[in-house]
Amino acid sequence: MEDYHISRGKHFYTIGLSYKKADAEIRGHFSLTEESKQRLLEQAKEEGIDGILVTSTCNRTEIYGFAQHPFQLIKLLCEHTHGTVEEFEKVAYVYKNKQAITHIFKVGTGLDSQILGDFEIISQLKIAFVRSKKLGLVNAFLERLVNAVIQASKRIKNETEISTGATSVSFASVQYILKHIDKVSEKNILLFGTGKIGRNTCENLVKHTRNNHITLINRTKDKAERIAGKFNLIVKDYADLQAEIRNSDILIVATGAQNPTISKELIYPKKELLILDLSIPKNVSDDVHELENVKLIHLDHLSQMTDETLEKRKQFIPQAKEIITEVESEFNRWLETRKFAPTIKALKKKLKTMKDDELDFQRKKISDFNDEQAEIVSNRIIQKIMKHFANHLKGDAETTDESLELIQKVFQLEEVNK
């Protein structure tokens, strides 16, 4: 990307891993908390990286950024997570320049989501953009790229039906409960964790189960109380967790902690219990599988569920791809203009210097020289010359490099390459 005069880093990379090759455990090793994202960005800045975005969801962790070599970004990820380079190499992907651009469009528009048409990732991209911008880590390229991805995402939402129907991890969990549990409205349901996934799950539970026995527990009680107040639900203290699990028929875990919050010891083994773990890393310990009366389902299983809604969405993929191609092509055309932006800027400066020298010469020769009119006329001439050069460079992409070289040679624009 050095030809585009955008970053000190030679190339634009996407490095990351997703549900496609990395299971929940490995994704958990590479998941980033809000604090670790911040520390990663601060280190990137210290190391001279001038353009970088970081996202981490239950389905993927990715870094988009400029670097001399992708290992700069891989090293940052491994240093701020529990993952190793060896683990990363087995399941990861690395995309460079145009491929990296294509990938972020695919991800940001929901076509690469574990549940087709789930647009949660676009909000994560927006948050990542704001976080990086606050640290001065968003260059012109990243700003334009993220805005283009947001534009494509909006158009796909508005012009296709790829996101119609309730389909998300939170909805899939409720759908699973409805399919596998009889008389759901009579069961005691405990929701542990009231972050974004927890809130969405709570709304879907209330809407689809008609259950009046839903209890919320969160480490920070006031968060649970705000949600409970909206739906008239019960809130219990975190200290009551074990007792509430014992009273429950269904336990939904959406705590988002870095280590398991539910272990075998917390569960009463003689009662049937369905546990849905919606967290990455896994928040329910694997030893829970040893309990005969307990059925543990992780979000990866829920995300694989297909229903009529998902099948219906697939027919809109070609239309969505057309929109992406259109917006991505527009972005790439803008990117090509970055190639000649420094030359155009240097040419304008050169013409202005030539103009000033000539006006000074004429001013000395002509006694009644009209400075104001001369400035207006000469500036308009420069403007027209610049427009012709710019139009030529935009219109003939195949010979852009040769044209730039000729302009730089004719007008002696040595500063462009400095």
Curated annotation (Swiss-Prot):
It catalyses: (S)-4-amino-5-oxopentanoate + tRNA(Glu) + NADP(+) = L-glutamyl-tRNA(Glu) + NADPH + H(+). The active site is at 58 (nucleophile). Keywords: NADP, Oxidoreductase, Porphyrin biosynthesis. Its EC number is 1.2.1.70. GO terms for biological process: protoporphyrinogen IX biosynthetic process from glutamate. Pathway: Porphyrin-containing compound metabolism; protoporphyrin-IX biosynthesis; 5-aminolevulinate from L-glutamyl-tRNA(Glu): step 1/2. The record marks 103 as: Important for activity. It comes from the Bacteria. InterPro entries: 4pyrrol_synth_GluRdtase, 4pyrrol_synth_GluRdtase_dimer, 4pyrrol_synth_GluRdtase_N, GluRdtase_CS, GluRdtase_dimer_dom_sf, GluRdtase_N_sf, NAD(P)-bd_dom_sf, Shikm_DH/Glu-tRNA_Rdtase. Catalyzes the NADPH-dependent reduction of glutamyl-tRNA(Glu) to glutamate 1-semialdehyde (GSA). Homodimer. Possesses an unusual extended V-shaped dimeric structure with each monomer consisting of three distinct domains arranged along a curved 'spinal' alpha-helix. The N-terminal catalytic domain specifically recognizes the glutamate moiety of the substrate. The second domain is the NADPH-binding domain, and the third C-terminal domain is responsible for dimerization. During catalysis, the active site Cys acts as a nucleophile attacking the alpha-carbonyl group of tRNA-bound glutamate with the formation of a thioester intermediate between enzyme and glutamate, and the concomitant release of tRNA(Glu). The thioester intermediate is finally reduced by direct hydride transfer from NADPH, to form the product GSA. This is Glutamyl-tRNA reductase. It comes from Christiangramia forsetii (strain DSM 17595 / CGMCC 1.15422 / KT0803) (Gramella forsetii).
